[in-house]
Amino acid sequence: MNINATLLGQAISFALFVWFCMKYVWPPLMKAIEERQKKIADGLQAAERAAKDLDLAQANASDQLKEAKRTATEIIEQANKRKSQILDEAREEAQAERQKILAQAEAELEAERNRARDDLRKQVATLAVAGAEKILERSIDKDAQKDILDNITAKL
């Protein structure tokens, strides 16, 4: 194998070509490759962050759902307590009203009894005076009759 000028020219041309590629072609290619690697790495990191954010959001949503359920349960319990309280108050008011009505009815009944007794006493006294008049066959004047009726009424 002879080393001649052609081979030497080709070697120099190849060296210039390699130098030119290393100086002007290789850096933009490496820069493009590095940018592409960086974009891919950033995309992977973003995907990991998104997955973590999704997990965090799901956990947060689960916590909020649990809190909402707990709050709803508390509200329902409070409503049930309030319902029971209102029902108890209504029962107490109804019982008090019942007692009041019964007391009024008893008072009215007692007043009616007393009035009926007084009327009955007066009638008995009048009948007694009438019977006594017939027995005595004489008339008693009005003042004496009134005194006798008052005495009999007071004694009954």
Curated annotation (Swiss-Prot):
Residue spans crossing the bilayer: 7-29
GO MF annotation, one: proton-transporting ATPase activity, rotational mechanism
Entry keyword set: ATP synthesis, Cell inner membrane, Cell membrane, CF(0), Hydrogen ion transport, Ion transport, Membrane, Transmembrane, Transmembrane helix, Transport
Classification via InterPro entries: ATP_synth_B-like_membr_sf, ATP_synth_b/b'su_bac/chlpt, ATP_synth_F0_bsu_bac, ATP_synthase_B_chain
Location(s) in or outside the cell: Cell inner membrane
Membrane topology: Single-pass membrane protein
GO cellular component: plasma membrane; proton-transporting ATP synthase complex
Pfam family, one: ATP-synt_B
Cysteines engaged in disulfide bonds, as pairs: none
Chief subcellular location: membrane
Description of how the protein assembles with itself and partners: F-type ATPases have 2 components, F(1) - the catalytic core - and F(0) - the membrane proton channel. F(1) has five subunits: alpha(3), beta(3), gamma(1), delta(1), epsilon(1). F(0) has three main subunits: a(1), b(2) and c(10-14). The alpha and beta chains form an alternating ring which encloses part of the gamma chain. F(1) is attached to F(0) by a central stalk formed by the gamma and epsilon chains, while a peripheral stalk is formed by the delta and b chains.
Function: F(1)F(0) ATP synthase produces ATP from ADP in the presence of a proton or sodium gradient. F-type ATPases consist of two structural domains, F(1) containing the extramembraneous catalytic core and F(0) containing the membrane proton channel, linked together by a central stalk and a peripheral stalk. During catalysis, ATP synthesis in the catalytic domain of F(1) is coupled via a rotary mechanism of the central stalk subunits to proton translocation. Component of the F(0) channel, it forms part of the peripheral stalk, linking F(1) to F(0).
Family in the record: Belongs to the ATPase B chain family.
Protein name: ATP synthase subunit b
Organism, scientific name: Vibrio alginolyticus
